[in-house]
């Protein structure tokens, strides 16, 4: 008796056929850019604390959505749904590095006032934005390979 089972290709974790990771990725990108802009505005304003608070909120939301996206990316990667090419690995590493840098950045931003942004806070924000933009840029070729 022939018991062949039809093989259905696995799909990324999705809602209504829309991959969740692709929906979540823009949130940390926008939030980390917003945090950087708030840091620069804080320094230009002479230390208006509203900009420091706004930067911290951007970092918090960016990290929350980023960690969720990172977990989904890892699951898709383990399930072999994200290409394990040089681009796929680079995307994963740049994205995780950006989250790690921004995690350190949020701890720096919890300091008091000027010292939270001037120096290491702004530097970490710049590094985090560069890393997340590279990760987002590398994502497009990785998605096209899957389709």
Regions found by a protein language model. Give the residues of each.
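Individual transmembrane alpha-helices with interfacial aromatic-anchor signatures
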Residues: 91-93, 117-128
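Core segments of alpha-helical transmembrane spans in multipass integral membrane proteins
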Residues: 30-37, 56-77, 93-103
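Membrane-water interface at the C-terminal end of transmembrane alpha helices
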Residues: 130-147
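Transmembrane alpha-helix entry/boundary detector in multi-pass membrane proteins
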Residues: 17-26, 43-65, 87-91, 121
């Amino acid at each position: 008796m022939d018991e062949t089972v039809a093989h259905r290709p696995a799909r990324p974790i999705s809602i209504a056929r829309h991959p969740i990771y692709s929906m979540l990725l823009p949130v940390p990108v926008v939030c980390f850019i917003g945090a950087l802009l708030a840091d620069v505005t804080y320094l230009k304003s002479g230390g208006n604390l509203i900009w420091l608070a706004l930067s911290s909120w951007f970092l918090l939301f960016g990290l929350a959505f980023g960690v969720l996206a990172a977990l989904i990316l890892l699951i898709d990667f383990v399930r072999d749904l994200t290409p394990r090419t040089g681009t796929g690995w680079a995307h994963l590493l740049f994205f995780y590095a950006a989250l790690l840098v921004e995690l350190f950045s949020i701890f720096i931003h919890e300091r008091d006032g000027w010292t939270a942004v001037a120096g290491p806070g702004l530097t970490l924000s710049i590094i985090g934005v560069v890393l997340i933009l590279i990760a987002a840029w590398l994502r497009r070729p990785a998605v096209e390979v899957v389709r």
